[in-house]
UniProtKB/Swiss-Prot annotation:
Protein name per the record: WUSCHEL-related homeobox 5
Origin species: Oryza sativa subsp. indica (Rice)
InterPro entries attached to this UniProt entry: HD, Homeodomain-like_sf, WUSCHEL-like
Pfam family, one: Homeodomain
Species classification: Eukaryota, Viridiplantae, Streptophyta, Embryophyta, Tracheophyta
Any one Gene Ontology BP term: plant organ development
Annotated CDD domains: homeodomain (cd00086)
Top-level taxon of origin: Eukaryota
Biased composition (Pro residues): 22-31
Length: 313
């Protein structure tokens, strides 16, 4: 069985053995006034309403970080409304600035959050129902339209309207106008006119000039009527009148042409003259009897249409 022996040595051995140093002597006790002052200094500051109102008024005036001299002046002023220290004034300004910055940041964050989350609705303007103009200023009737110029004549349909338009016409072409196209109209031949060969006359065709003219008026109608009458009279002269026309049979059984007395022709000869320049074609045919010993030249010639005398060829 082993025994443990403890060796007592100097101060170093006592610390090593677990013994502590002797306690230091206590500070002298405080007086009751000093103890009360220390308790007030360590106590939490509770500002009164008057002190808060004075400090907020200084902050609104632009005071943010007061100097040491300003802190002393403010502390002396606030002590009239309750207990306060200089450090309380300094910390109040620091905390109030931080709270204001935090409040502004929160307001900005809330504003942009609402803006991005859902746009605000468009404002609706509520207007009371009212007339476009007062009753005293309301016109009783529409003003009359301005009168047209004295030199122009307006259409009858625009007499009571608000728009007046002057009639315009194309200029009337002159006889020697070079910029109007001239062309010949085709001549129609309604029927074949038969007349003796010696009475056929060759006349130049009548050309018709077409112009772009203005709308018909009394002067233009009169001129057109005069031209139509002149042309009808000219055609009557050239055609020899309605009494000189004959209607030929499609398959005649007897000779239809008569030889002229003063102009003998050979047997079997045919003379057909058609004038292409006249508006109506004239044709004359003359036939002589096949037998040269005809007793009389006055007898009508005979023409074998069906080839009886020639053997049916």
């Amino acid at each position: 069985m082993e025994t443990t022996t403890t060796t007592l040595g100097g101060g170093g051995g006592g610390r090593a053995g677990g013994f502590s140093d002797p306690p230091s002597p206590l500070s002298p006790p405080l007086s009751p006034a000093s103890a009360a002052a220390a308790a007030l200094a360590n106590a939490r500051w509770t500002p009164t309403k008057e002190q808060i109102a004075v400090l907020e008024g200084l902050y609104r005036q632009g005071l943010r970080t007061p100097t040491a001299e300003q802190i002393q002046q403010i502390t002396a002023r606030l002590r009239e409304h309750g207990h306060i220290e200089g450090k309380n004034v300094f910390y109040w300004f620091q905390n109030h600035k931080a709270r204001q910055r935090q409040k502004q940041k929160q307001q900005s964050f809330d504003y942009f959050s609402k803006l991005f989350r859902r746009p605000p609705p468009l404002p609706v303007l509520h207007r009371p129902l009212a007339r476009p103009f007062p009753l005293a200023m309301a016109p009783t009737a529409m003003p009359p339209p301005p009168p047209p110029p004295a030199t122009t004549t307006t259409a009858a349909c625009n007499a009571g309207g608000v728009m007046f338009r002057t009639p315009s016409f194309m200029p009337v072409a002159t006889n020697n106008a070079s910029y109007y196209p001239q062309q010949q109209t085709p001549l129609l031949y309604p029927g074949m006119e038969v007349c003796p060969h010696d009475k056929s006359t060759a006349q130049p065709p009548a050309t018709t000039t077409m112009y772009l003219q203005a709308p018909p008026s009394s002067a233009h109608l009169a001129a057109a009527a005069g031209r139509g009458a002149a042309e009808a009279e000219g055609h009557g002269r050239r055609g020899g009148g309605a009494g000189g026309r004959e209607t030929l049979q499609l398959f005649p059984l007897q000779p239809t042409f008569v030889l002229p007395d003063h102009k003998p022709l050979r047997a079997g000869s045919a003379c057909a003259a058609v004038s292409p320049t006249t508006p109506s074609a004239s044709a004359s045919f003359s036939w002589e009897s096949e037998s040269s010993d005809s007793p009389s030249s006055e007898a009508p010639p005979f023409y074998d249409f069906f080839g009886v005398h020639s053997g049916g060829r």
